[in-house]
């Protein structure tokens, strides 16, 4: 018998994750669609693949799983407000957010992010109430800084144990 939903949510809160914004251009309108995630991972070195998961019932779901390309911006510790902005439902976001455009693939990227990754959508897998989106990395750059992390429903940063 599967575990309860409450216990499963507690497990998720017990796991720290790097915070990223994944974004694309909507096919019909060319509007930028993006969301905050902590499910981004590198998947393969040969070929260079990355992946993230997205819930089926989010407003960004359809454009994100049908896009041909997407950008991933790993946020730095000073970009908490950007993470909060893209964690809100699309209809509640209000203000326009500035973006860089990918140098190789036309994808939206967050300026001054810890890293920016330009991807072509490789595969989309359905699993439970999520889709797993796999991207082929066409270009990437690291810009330096400290990562923004998410743990226990809070944003924070990394502190090495040796520094305590």
PLM region descriptions:
Residues 1-164:
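Basic, polyanion-binding surface patches
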């Amino acid at each position: 018998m599967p575990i309860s939903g409450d216990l499963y949510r507690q497990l998720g809160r017990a796991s720290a994750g790097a915070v990223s914004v994944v974004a694309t251009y909507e096919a019909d309108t060319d509007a930028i669609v993006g969301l905050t995630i902590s499910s981004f991972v590198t998947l393969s070195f040969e070929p260079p693949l990355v992946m993230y998961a997205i819930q089926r019932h989010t407003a960004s779901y359809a454009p994100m799983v049908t896009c041909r390309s997407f950008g991933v911006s790993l946020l730095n510790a000073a970009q908490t407000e950007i993470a909060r902005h893209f964690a809100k439902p699309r209809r509640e976001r209000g203000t326009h957010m500035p973006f860089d455009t990918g140098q190789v693939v036309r994808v939206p990227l967050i300026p001054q992010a810890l890293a920016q990754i330009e991807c072509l959508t490789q595969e989309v897998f359905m699993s439970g109430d999520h889709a797993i989106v796999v991207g082929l990395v066409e270009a990437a750059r690291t810009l330096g800084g400290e990562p923004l992390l998410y743990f226990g429903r809070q944003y924070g940063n990394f502190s090495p144990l040796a520094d305590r």
